[in-house]
C-alpha cells in the first residue's frame, strides 16, 4: 500500500502474478529490481491484452510470418521501442523489437484429426431412434434380397454355434410370435393422410408454358394490389381490376376474411366476375391476367360436380337466386336479400302435434339435431334484419324436403343483428331455433310441422267432421220427444234440453252472475285447502323418517353398555382439589373430545395421559352446559377416576379428571366390551344429528299447519 497504491481498487480478475507485479512496483526504489520489473511489466501488458498469444506453441510460431520476419531482421535495427506502460509505472518502458510479442489476431486453424472413438461415446441425433432402426432394417432386407439368403444362412449356421440357438428361439414363438419388435410395429394399421391431387388451373390448360412462366415472373415482382374486403368481390372491386388492366396486363388482388380461408373458391369468383385468368396464387394474393383477344370463357368445360353437390343443388332449386360470392364449398346458397320482403297472402303455417308427443325438444334431441346440422351445407345467405317474408316462405318450402334450415349471415353486411333475424324468422315460420351466433342461424321445423299438402288434408277432414256434427245436431233436435208434464191440472210441453244451447244458457244464467268477491274467496279457500293437504303430507313423511332414525339410534345405543359406578369413591379435600385444578389448568397437553363423544378411543387416550401425569384435561366443544356435565359424568364413570372440576375456556369447556391414588391401568379388552368403536360412534353421532334436524323440521311443519287452519277458519267466518 505504499506510494498511495491500493491493490483492491483494481479489477477483481487480477491474477496472482499481476498482484506480485504491483508489489514489486511499490519497491521500485531498489535499483536491483528495476530490470526485473521491466520484464514483468512487458509480459503483463501482452498477456493482459491478448491472453491467447502467450502460449508457447511451435505450430503457432511457425505460422506467424510477420513475427518470423521481424525476428530475422532484428540485427538490422536494435533501437529500443517505447511501448505502453501500466498506470502505476513512473517512467517510460523501452524494449527491443525482439522482446515485443505480435498482437495481431489470427484465426485458429481447425485440427483435422479423425477420432476413432467418435461413434462409440459421442451422442448423435437420430441414430438410436425408432426411425433409424426402421431404416437399418430396410437396408438389411434389401441386402438379403440381392444375395442368396438361404445359402448364406446355412453357411453361417455351420460356422457359428450360437446362431442355431437364436433360430430355435425364433421358431418357438413363445414370447414374440416369431417376429422382431420392429416387424410387429409395421403390421399395425396406420391411416396415412392422403395428399390432395393437384388439379391444373384454367391458366395452365389455356396459356402456353412460356407465356405462363413470363407472367408468373412479372407477377412475383408486383407490389400494388386491390383489396377485397368482407363484402367479397363487389362491382367496385371489379372496376378497380379492369382499370389496372388498362395500364398493365396483370392485376394483383388481396383477399380478406372470409374468402382468404378458401382461395380456390376466391379464384373461381374472381375468374367468373372479371373474365380473367389467375396465373399466380400465393397466400392471400391472386394475380389475374386479363387475357388476349382470342381468349373466351364460353368454351370452357364445366367442372364435374360430386353427387353431394348435385343433390344439394336439386334441394335448393326453385327457392330463389343463388349467391355467387359464396366463400365456402359448393353448392351456392340462396341469396335471401334478393327475395321479396313482403309476400301477399303469406300466413304462418298451421301446426298440429301428433298424439302422445310433446312439441318441446329435450336436451338429447337438441344435441342430436345440432350434430346433424353441422355437416349440412348452408341453404340461405342473409344480410338484413327485417322484411323476411320471402325468406320465410322459402324456408317453409325447404322444410318439406329437409327438417333443418341453415342460414349464414353475410360478412361485411352493415347493421346486422343475428338476434333480430332469428326472432323475426321464428315468428314468421313458427320453427324451433336450435343454434344462433354471429355467423349462422339454424332453424328446426318442429315436431308439429305440417306441410301444405298435409295441412290441406287436415282442414278438409275437419270441415267434413264439422258438417257431420251439424247434421247430427239438427237431426237430434227434430226428433226430440215431447214430454207431457201435468201440474195442478195444467198440461205443459217441455223438451229434453240435455246437450243443447238452452242447457248452456241456463247454467250461465244460474252460475255466471256470481259476485267476483265470492269467486276470490272460493279461490283462496281452495288454495289454502291444497296447501294444508300438502303440508300434512310432508309432515307424515317427516314422522316416518323420525321413526326410522329412532330405530337406528336404539340399535346403536344397545351396543353401548355404560359401566356401573364404583361405590368406593376416593375422597379429596378442598385443598387437594384446588391444587389439582390449578395443575390441570396449567397443563398444555389436553385431550379433545369430538363429535363421536365418549368411545373406546377416548378412554385409551385418557389412560395414556394418566401414564405420565396424574391429572388429564379433556376439552369438549358442546354448547349446552347440561351436555357438558353429562359427558363429564360419563368420563368419570368409565375411567374410574375422580372429577375435579369443569372450567369454561376460550375454546370450550375443560373437564379435569384425577386418576386417583391407587390408579391401575385396566386392560384394553375390558374397555372394549362396553364401549362403542370409532366407526359405530360416528354412526351414532350422524343419526343423532339427523334426528335433531328431522324433529326441528317437523315442528316447523306443525306450526305451518296450525297457521293454515286458523287462516281457513277466518276465511270461512268472513264469507258468512
Swiss-Prot record:
**Residue range covered by the transit peptide:** 1-77
Q: What happens when the gene is disrupted?
A: Plants are albinos.
Compartment(s) of residence:
Plastid, Chloroplast stroma
Q: Where is the CRM domain?
A: 205-301, 359-456, 570-670
Q: Which Gene3D superfamilies match?
A: YhbY-like
* Coiled coil spans: 131-159, 447-477, 517-553
* Protein name per UniProt: Chloroplastic group IIA intron splicing facilitator CRS1, chloroplastic
Q: Give the organism the record lists.
A: Arabidopsis thaliana (Mouse-ear cress)
